[in-house]
Regions:
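Basic, Lys/Arg-enriched alpha-helical interface segments
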Residues: 1-61, 70-74, 81-125
């Protein structure tokens, strides 16, 4: 399964920003969790409103927030701990909505480009 961080329009990655603040042991635990996701293991993920919360049963209860895109692709939105869970979920949901909007806009733009190419070909005839 392909696992990729969500990159915002400004080029930043909320997941990477969170990950970079972790200590070495926590970063190792999160890396193992990400590897499990890449292997398709979502048994530690609780799903709600399109967002998945991967629970790491260690330390302060680390979480990774994600969404599935089809059956072979996972998008990472960020992370947090049990203590900040509700605000982390809210942030992940905002990022997920932004992701879906940008994806929809990209599809619409490609469709417009394809239609414009067809029109130009017809005009050349």
């Amino acid at each position: 399964m392909k696992v990729q961080e969500y990159i915002k329009e400004d080029g930043s990655s909320p997941y990477q920003e969170w990950f970079d603040r972790l200590d070495a042991v926590a970063a190792a635990k999160v890396t193992v969790a990400k590897s499990r996701l890449e292997l398709g293991n979502t048994s530690n993920v609780k799903w709600f409103d399109g967002i998945g919360e991967y629970r790491i049963d260690w330390g302060p209860g680390y979480r990774i927030y994600l969404a599935e895109e089809g059956k072979q692709f996972i998008v990472l939105f960020g992370g947090g701990t049990k203590k900040s869970q509700q605000s982390d979920i809210n942030r992940a949901q905002e990022l997920y909505q932004e992701y879906k909007r940008r994806k929809r806009e990209a599809i619409e733009e490609k469709e417009k480009e394809a239609e414009n190419k067809k029109i130009k070909k017809r005009k050349k005839r």
